[in-house]
Amino acid sequence: MTAPCSQPAQLPGRRQLGLVPFPPPPPRTPLLWLLLLLLAAVAPARGWESGDLELFDLVEEVQLNFYQFLGVQQDASSADIRKAYRKLSLTLHPDKNKDENAETQFRQLVAIYEVLKDDERRQRYDDILINGLPDWRQPVFYYRRVRKMSNAELALLLFIILTVGHYAVVWSIYLEKQLDELLSRKKREKKKKTGSKSVDVSKLGASEKNERLLMKPQWHDLLPCKLGIWFCLTLKALPHLIQDAGQFYAKYKETRLKEKEDALTRTELETLQKQKKVKKPKPEFPVYTPLETTYIQSYDHGTSIEEIEEQMDDWLENRNRTQKKQAPEWTEEDLSQLTRSMVKFPGGTPGRWEKIAHELGRSVTDVTTKAKQLKDSVTCSPGMVRLSELKSTVQNSRPIKTATTLPDDMITQREDAEGVAAEEEQEGDSGEQETGATDARPRRRKPARLLEATAKPEPEEKSRAKRQKDFDIAEQNESSDEESLRKERARSAEEPWTQNQQKLLELALQQYPRGSSDRWDKIARCVPSKSKEDCIARYKLLVELVQKKKQAKS
């Protein structure tokens, strides 16, 4: 156990520790209370009103005491003032007073009565009598003077004030520069005395120039002189200013035009870039006029069939050669143009295929063959043979110039007028075997005219009497058969040739060349519903058309 301390331990003082004592806080004075007392001690001020200004003007105008003007005492009652006003109004009224100043005197009388009959305004007038009017030390004095000035006087006063203010500003600028120069000079002198830093020679030269430039304001620095000098200089420089303005306007116009041209070129370039594909201009189609046949030699019907066959064979060979050489390939655009032209020139229009060929820039044969191919590819009528099959058979049969029979696939079916069907004549036993083997396949019906020709009996002697002929049944049947044949030929001649029949005729002419046996009979068998005479007549017509085309080209 430790013994208890007899004396408490003493801490070292602040000075022993080396600490600086804090300064005592400053005494707090009640500044807020002082400000409040000052504000409360300020007396309320009263501003001047329009009534006061009118009263000041009336006092200056009358130049007399209002009580003396009415002839009453200053402490008179309102009744005494009213009586005095009535008496003076009877004497000073303009109708009874012939004096020149009667109107002004009567107006002053009314104004004095209006002031004295009101207690408040009378009290203000009594204060003016004691204290007098406001003097130059009060702002209302100048305000009253300015109110009475005209516009010209106000403008002159304002101009004088501005002139004085401008001159004072000029002097203030001069004095400020002088002060700056003086301070800078003192600094330079101090630097020279101390010698701590070298003084720059260029700065000294600049300070000397500034001293020379500093000049006291002269009379021509006044505002009126400055305005006059500025006006003269503007008049002198006015032509140059106008010229500069014209040049500036011309440059502005040129820039605007250039901007417009640039904008147009940009828009054109943008449109050209946007146009990916330029549409072809539609050609102007000439009005089709059929060729006049007056200058074309008519067909000589006296020519032999051999000459006609030679001409037709030459024409077919030339047409095939030109088609192989000149016919370009058909593109999708050409096909679409062909369909549009076929819609534009429907069937029945004169010179339809010539117009379509002129529009496409191709030959008539090329256009017709392509149109036929399109029709065959879309639809194929029952009972007819496809042109592609016929062409393939023709091309395969060309190198072999021997007369061969058509295969069963290419044999067309047809019905005669009476609806009687007969099998084709076959040579020998092989024909009978083929007919037995091909019963399931489509079989060609034999025309009625061939049956009639085979079943027809040989003509008897022409010297038989007419009476006996009338009673002969065979002769009557023969005459009726001849009439029916004539009617059928006339009907078939009247029927128009279709495109399929025309194509079959052309293919048959190529398949059975000139010199083959029974050529026209075989050709007539290939063309449905057409006889041998019809095929020959059509052949002659085609030859005539070829001759006309050759003459037209030459």
UniProtKB/Swiss-Prot annotation:
It comes from the Eukaryota. It is a single-pass type I membrane protein. Residues 421-432, 473-482 have a biased composition (Acidic residues). Interacts (via J domain) with HSPA5. Interacts (via cytosolic domain) with ribosomes. Interacts (via SANT 2 domain) with SERPINA3; the interaction delays the formation of the covalent inhibitory complex SERPINA3-chymotrypsin, but does not alter the catalytic activity of SERPINA3. Interacts (via SANT 2 domain) with ITIH4 (via C-terminus); the interaction protects ITIH4 against in vitro cleavage by kallikrein. Keywords: Chaperone, DNA-binding, Endoplasmic reticulum, Membrane, Microsome, Nucleus, Phosphoprotein, Repeat, Signal, Transmembrane, Transmembrane helix. The modification Phosphoserine is found at residues 381, 430, 479-480, 484, 492. This is DnaJ homolog subfamily C member 1. Residues 65-129 form the J domain. GO terms for cellular component: endomembrane system; endoplasmic reticulum; endoplasmic reticulum membrane; membrane; nuclear membrane; plasma membrane. It is found in: Endoplasmic reticulum membrane; Nucleus membrane; Microsome membrane. Residues 455-472, 483-494 have a biased composition (Basic and acidic residues). CDD domains: DnaJ, SANT. It comes from Homo sapiens (Human). It holds the Pfam family Myb_DNA-binding. InterPro entries: DnaJ_domain (IPR001623), DnaJ_domain_CS (IPR018253), DnaJ_domain_protein (IPR052606), Homeodomain-like_sf (IPR009057), J_dom_sf (IPR036869), SANT/Myb (IPR001005), SANT_dom (IPR017884). The keyword Repeat applies. Coiled coil: none annotated. Residues 392-405 have a biased composition (Polar residues). The lineage of its organism: Eukaryota, Metazoa, Chordata, Craniata, Vertebrata. Residues 392-500 are annotated as: Disordered. GO terms for molecular function: ATPase activator activity; DNA binding; protein-folding chaperone binding. Residues 325-379, 492-547 form the SANT domain.
